Amino acid sequence: MLTTTKVVIGDMMRELVYYVAVSIDGYIAAPDGSYDAFPVEGDHMAVYLSDFADALPAHVLAALDMHPPGNRFDTVIQGRASYDISRAAGIERPYAHLSEFVATRSKTTPPAGVTFTADALTTVRELKQQEGLAIYLCGGGNLAGELLPEIDRLILKRNPVVLGDGVRLFGNAGAVVQ
């Protein structure tokens, strides 16, 4: 059975929320970055669709004939590897209903509506000072490790899956944050 753990780590007006599926051994993806070991059907989907629909990619919302409620997130930040999964599937703006930021050092020009940032920490700090809803930290683990001091809320979708290896929840972050 899937369980959800909510941990509040701060009291900011605009939060950075790391909402992520995780195996019971602490991995958010397989070594190749795939996440198909995590179930997409089951009781947890009711919570996802009712409380976290803003965190669904735009193409998934369209397939479900849903409109994003716009009541939880208005911005998403993700790492380049996470973003490239969508790009490989031909999806230029996976979260077209949100302001999209991608942490990357690439000098390529992003598609319209997507902002590339080489300094995710500064970008998140600036976003948190602006009016708006919460900021969805979509992944991956290395970006989460980099942004760990700024994460205000951690929502783990713990899955009864053991991956044994892969992308860790906070990448290779070694710092202790309380």
Where are these regions (language model features)?
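Enzymes that bind and transform nitrogen-containing heteroaromatic metabolites
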Residues: L2-Q178
